[in-house]
Amino acid sequence: MARSLRKGPFIDEHLIKKVLVAQEKNDRKPIKTWSRRSVVVPEMIGLTIAVHNGRVHVPVSINENMIGHKLGEFAITRTFKGHSGDRKV
């Protein structure tokens, strides 16, 4: 079920504060966050946000195509090693 339009997009308060400070200072170093549930908003365009994937922080450069998606979509959590029987010639 989609989120109600009257509520607006969800973004953690601590993350939006860091984004606004980075924009004010024109700071380009990555913003570390564990908030995979936060939605990408237009204020984040051009910033690099390091999203935690359970092990490390994955740097994600935000562009206009990412608006409306959640940060967790861009930091893969599972590593695929391949199927064991794929060695057929």
From Swiss-Prot:
Keywords: Ribonucleoprotein, Ribosomal protein, RNA-binding, rRNA-binding. Coiled coil: none annotated. SUPFAM superfamilies: Ribosomal protein S19. The keyword Ribosomal protein applies. It comes from the Bacteria. GO terms for cellular component: cytoplasm; small ribosomal subunit. One of its GO terms (biological process) is translation. PROSITE patterns: RIBOSOMAL_S19. GO terms for molecular function: rRNA binding; structural constituent of ribosome. The keyword rRNA-binding applies. PANTHER family: RIBOSOMAL PROTEIN S19P FAMILY MEMBER, SMALL RIBOSOMAL SUBUNIT PROTEIN US19M. Belongs to the universal ribosomal protein uS19 family. Protein S19 forms a complex with S13 that binds strongly to the 16S ribosomal RNA. This is Small ribosomal subunit protein uS19. It comes from Ruthia magnifica subsp. Calyptogena magnifica. The gene is rpsS.
